[in-house]
Amino acid sequence: MTEIQKLTNNKEIIAYLAEKFPLCFSLEGEAKPLKIGLFQDLAEALANDEKVSKTQLRQALRQYTSNWRYLHGCRAGAVRVDLNGEPAGILEQEHVEHAAAKLAEAKAKVAERRAVEKANNPKANKKRSVYHSGNKSENKKSAGKKFSKPRQVEQIFVNVDLANLQKGDVVRVKAGDKTTKAEILEVVKEGARVELENGLILTVSADRLFA
């Protein structure tokens, strides 16, 4: 008899729910607002499923509905869906405002974290610039030129461990020969959904994510 492999974390459970109920849950793009009382429907639908427990389902749902993708989708006029993707009522204004407040709060925390990081980085950046410069006169001559040498600093970055990534973590994303800072919005299968400093949101593979 094959031993049933139990799911152990929210990421796995959400992926499992998206597989079982693809018209209700999603791993990419904007998430749909869920029907009020969906947990009870979910618990009944998976009552005989040994992979997940009610406690795990509740925790996974809490994480799913606090995700930025979900909060973005909770706007005026949005329609809630049930497990089969069927309409289950229009999102109430009270819940629209609550989602907007939660999203603003989450973004404020990210902005605060970035500010702290920027405050800590200048010293390191100054040290690097000293290593790559000869003297002041040379620096003035090279001020208007493009150098590829400083880009070599990227070589010190190491690939991140997806298992340790969390929403809100700041990483570097490699695009060609360049890297740019990005904020983790969600860890997905074999990669992560990130927001770049310019506001662009995209999904990148693990081999392009660096610490």
From Swiss-Prot:
One of its GO terms (molecular function) is RNA strand-exchange activity. The keyword Transmembrane does not apply. The keyword Chaperone applies. One of its GO terms (cellular component) is cytosol. Keywords: Chaperone, Cytoplasm, RNA-binding. GO terms for biological process: post-transcriptional regulation of gene expression. Its main location: cytoplasm. It is found in: Cytoplasm. SUPFAM superfamilies: FinO-like. Residues 113-147 are annotated as: Disordered. It comes from the Bacteria. It holds the Pfam family ProQ_C. Belongs to the ProQ family. RNA chaperone with significant RNA binding, RNA strand exchange and RNA duplexing activities. PANTHER family: RNA CHAPERONE PROQ. NCBIfam families: PRK04950.1. This is RNA chaperone ProQ.
